[in-house]
């Protein structure tokens, strides 16, 4: 838990992001120089940490605060055939070396690690929250773009490069210039069947993949306040897809209830002190944002992507756009390129697009609520002929929770594959990949060319749309069943 610094009693009206930043400035930059910001927690995985550990080793430096680092194995781990967590269960030699190196580095430098075979293992952005390591008011970094997910707790969380990972290891600080602030005001309430994934995809389509560049986004409004923590994590997770540095949601009782009692959460009097501080974090009435964007949540329907970046999205009820629908020359050219790669014909109803693989997984949408939503839709159904559906929980803990609820049986009875935890098909760095020309409906966060395997074509969807699509064989919502 981060304690407020002396100047936190200022009467200046501040946003949530500005308060967290203020309370972490070790030294303020002068004449345009960056501030030196204290980092409360650094999360590590097997892909972006080896070079940083090597840097410490080569310079003879120690890890300044091992207790403020937390590691797990996620990006390259297989999601089938894992029984003991042995390195021998990883067939790919490069992946095996990366996982082995992480284990060796964590042992040498005293970092807490949750490896394959550990019930607490999983995708790093699920592990932090489930352990209670992620808390309101923190600064959190990781060598991974989707660190922004932790902002759902009212923390300022963002991805960093490997050289910065090493800098945090050595100093527990980062030199940074303050980010601009943007309020995303969601008016109205989401309709039944519309999820936080639909909302964030609609936001990205509205402001564009560069619309949030240089900003911290704060998601606000009644629809946000009514969301569970799982849903809020989905929102903040995809802030980076709008170009933002981070995404945040003000902590409230929903946040406190989620964190309380978890292994690394404060206890007793420390808990009371923490909550008292956390309650001071929400944006002050009258605080000014650098930019405000409004979106009518009540008007939203299930939303998907049709192209090759997360901003190329439309309501599921619409049709594949034509490049001529775009007035901006860059958007027109991007649409032409995307349509060619995705092998789509303008005017085709999105609901007519045939899907080969449904992937229910990733740090965006593979928590227990996501699995429950999909299982409720799949119950009593079979997936379409020729369809492959992979269900990959985002942590072993969630996998066991789902199995205790019988969700695994619902998935397997429907014909889906029930896998072990990992990043899986979100990215083509492990055995779970699309074949060239295959098309997926994926609950992950990126639909770039080749993201899920060379030549693979990705449509980003919500868990509900994923489940309905698996049943019908074409992009579908539960209303189509």
From Swiss-Prot:
It holds the Pfam family Aconitase. Gene3D superfamilies: Aconitase, domain 3. [4Fe-4S] cluster binds at residues 363, 423, 426. GO terms for molecular function: 3-isopropylmalate dehydratase activity; 4 iron, 4 sulfur cluster binding; metal ion binding. Keywords: 4Fe-4S, Amino-acid biosynthesis, Branched-chain amino acid biosynthesis, Iron, Iron-sulfur, Leucine biosynthesis, Lyase, Metal-binding. The keyword Lyase applies. Binds 1 [4Fe-4S] cluster per subunit. InterPro entries: 3-IsopropMal_deHydase_lsu, Acnase/IPM_dHydase_lsu_aba_1/3, Acoase/IPM_deHydtase_lsu_aba, Aconitase_4Fe-4S_BS, Aconitase_4Fe-4S_dom, IPM_dehydratase_rel_enz, IPMI_cat. Its EC number is 4.2.1.33. It is an enzyme of class 4 (lyase). HAMAP family: LeuC_type1 (MF_01026). Belongs to the aconitase/IPM isomerase family. LeuC type 1 subfamily. NCBIfam families: leuC, PRK05478.1, PRK12466.1. Heterodimer of LeuC and LeuD. This is 3-isopropylmalate dehydratase large subunit. The lineage of its organism: Bacteria, Bacillati, Actinomycetota, Actinomycetes, Mycobacteriales.
